[in-house]
Each structure stands twice: as C-alpha cells, then as structure tokens.
C-alpha cells in the first residue's frame, strides 16, 4: 500500500500543474449571502474591501411568487431561466476580504468549453476585476467579466471567506 501512495500523489501533482484549471473549488463553512459585487478597494494596509449590494437569488416557486408580486410575470407563468433576483433595497456595504479566500469563477477554457467552475486566488480575482491582468497571464482560461456580476459570498461575521460567481443560465 505504501508504494501506491507516492504514485497517486505524483499523478495528483501532475494534474494540478497542467495548464487546465481545476474544475472544483472547495469552499469554507460560513453564512452564504447573495450580492452584486460593485467594486473592490485596497485599504492602507494592503488588504481589500469588497463593495457589495446584497440581493436575494430565488429559484422555483419562490422565484415565481416574487416575480408575480413585483409584476415581472403574470400569475401562472414561470420566470425565465428558473431564477429571479430581488434587490428591493440598493444599499452598498463594505466587507473585508480574507486574502486567502477561495474564489470560484465560471470561465471559458482555451479549448472552447465554457461555464467551467474554476478556482483562483482572491488577489488574482481582484486584479481581474480591476482590469490589471495583461494578456496571457491567465493560463488555460478566459473570464469574461462584464458589469456587476452576482456572487454568493461566504461570510464569517463581516469577513468574506469565500466567493462563488453565480451561474446565470
């Protein structure tokens, strides 16, 4: 059994060092909140503050009820795509970002496959949001960020400890 362990470890390391980004990202435990990320600022000590507008991401019957209440659809209809985002109060908040927080983005791989959940560091995510990534720095994938995207934030108190880009069909 001891001989298999180094072989398995070598295979895992080889897979991790290839040009393909990982397809799964393990998120920490915490409170999950939906929000639009409006921007990221660097504060004096070099840490980040994420500017968010919290929202509700609803699916199924709950989404249909909310959409009917807001006049988006008529009674008996269903929301397009199976989801509805409620953002009745547009209020910006500043939340601290744990520099070690994992970030899961929906990217397009260089081979053409899209909407692949891919993990990046919090620092790389901030650089991509701020447009600081030169061409070629993203090895193996492209992330098409446009506007203020919805995310699921994993919070520990007022600290963001994980971020998942919300997939929108």
Regions found by a protein language model. Name each.
Residues 1-4:
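Positively charged n-region of N-terminal signal peptides that target proteins for export
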Residues 7-8:
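Terminal non-domain segments
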Residues 12-15:
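C-terminal motif of bacterial Sec signal peptides marking the signal peptidase cleavage site
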Residues 19-169:
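Solvent-exposed hydroxyl-ligand-binding patches built from regularly spaced Ser/Thr
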């Amino acid at each position: 059994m001891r001989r298999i362990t180094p072989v398995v470890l070598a295979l895992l390391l080889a897979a991790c060092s290839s040009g393909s980004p990982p397809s799964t990202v393990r998120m920490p435990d915490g409170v999950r909140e939906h929000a639009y990320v409006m921007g990221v600022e660097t504060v004096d000590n070099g840490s980040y503050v994420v500017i968010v507008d919290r929202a509700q991401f609803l699916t199924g019957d709950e989404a249909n009820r909310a959409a009917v209440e807001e006049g988006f659809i008529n009674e008996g209809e269903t929301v397009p795509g199976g989801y509805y985002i409620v953002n009745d109060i547009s209020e910006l908040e500043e939340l601290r970002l744990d520099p070690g927080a994992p970030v899961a983005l929906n990217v397009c791989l260089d081979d053409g496959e899209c909407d692949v959940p891919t993990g990046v560091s919090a620092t790389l995510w901030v650089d991509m949001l701020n447009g600081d990534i030169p061409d070629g720095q993203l090895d193996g994938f492209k992330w098409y960020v446009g506007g203020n995207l919805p995310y699921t934030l994993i919070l520990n108190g007022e600290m963001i400890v994980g971020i998942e880009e919300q997939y929108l069909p």
